[in-house]
Amino acid sequence: MITTLIIIGAAFLVGPRTFKFVLAYLLGYYNAFGPPLQIVQFMVWLIIIYFPKKFFSLGWYFCHDAFSSYFGDPNGGQLPVSTKFHSLTDMID
């Protein structure tokens, strides 16, 4: 356990990317599964830790039609953009 904490501390000092990689490795290493599933869990942790925006935007991309048909999406997935004010001076007037 002390060795693990030393490795985590050293990875934190090296940089954020190394820290995330070591964290994903340790989360995949300490689990209840055997070695084949440890590799799968490690890859899943890498995806979740390194690519959260891409991971969730991919889910939104594939499920957007289901979300929009269920919740009713008047903008077709686009953010509402106000065209009332074109600059800060228009907003003040």
From Swiss-Prot:
The chain crosses the membrane at residues 5-25, 32-52. Keywords: Membrane, Transmembrane, Transmembrane helix. GO terms for cellular component: membrane. It is a multi-pass membrane protein. It comes from the Viruses. It is found in: Membrane. Signal peptide: none annotated. This is Small hydrophobic protein. It comes from Tupaia virus (isolate Tupaia/Thailand/-/1986).
